[in-house]
Amino acid sequence: MILNTFNLQGKVALITGCDTGLGQGMAVGLAEAGCDIVGVNIVEPKETIEKVTAVGRRFLSLTADMSDISGHAALVEKAVAEFGKVDILVNNAGIIRREDAIEFSEKNWDDVMNLNIKSVFFMSQTVARQFIKQGHGGKIINIASMLSFQGGIRVPSYTASKSAVMGITRLLANEWAKHNINVNAIAPGYMATNNTQQLRADQDRSKEILDRIPAGRWGLPQDLQGPAVFLASSASDYVNGYTIAVDGGWLAR
């Protein structure tokens, strides 16, 4: 039965940045599909833990700054110590800094690049080594952006980092397919999250954005649940190196 290919019963998903918003939505969606969750955050994700355990799945909460790559191996070791394996990695942790390019600071550049792309690569590397050790392959889901496809304004390091996410997704897929590792990405459109709070608070800018989205609304965390489950499951075994836009039709305009 086709629905069985989406069943994640017995799988373990490691998700970075799942205390709120899109990360929380994906964590809950994966849990509902059968995954136990390892959540890596800088704060205790109390609400996410409640939602995951409410559907009968286990949740291991780990605290770390993902931009410090020296701690990545320990995170995977703790996940394996608790659950015996890792099957899925979702690289969701990320930040954005807004400032005109002409004034953009080195700190705002480095902070964003270190978390949004450097940590994505090195966490993927660490988890891929575990996948290879386990001998059964695995699934890596990176979180890209509309600004993986477009330039945007006033977010130079974010645009650069998310363009890089789409590129590194392709490279890792090319190199690791031989190990039965699928590396894909999801590019959310304009979503109602903390990252877009300033945009949504600006009535003129919000209207301008909504007027371009064929769906006529801001995206919600649950809009990423289906794509995340698909990319984490055997239903996507022949999908590799691809970035799926979940944008209400934004890129079609």
UniProtKB/Swiss-Prot annotation:
It catalyses: 2-dehydro-3-deoxy-D-gluconate + NAD(+) = 3-deoxy-D-glycero-2,5-hexodiulosonate + NADH + H(+). One of its GO terms (biological process) is pectin catabolic process. Pathway: Glycan metabolism; pectin degradation; 2-dehydro-3-deoxy-D-gluconate from pectin: step 5/5. Substrate binds at residue 145. One of its GO terms (molecular function) is 2-dehydro-3-deoxy-D-gluconate 5-dehydrogenase activity. Gene3D superfamilies: NAD(P)-binding Rossmann-like Domain. Its EC number is 1.1.1.127. NCBIfam families: kduD, PRK08993.1. This is 2-dehydro-3-deoxy-D-gluconate 5-dehydrogenase. It comes from Dickeya dadantii (strain 3937). The gene is kduD.
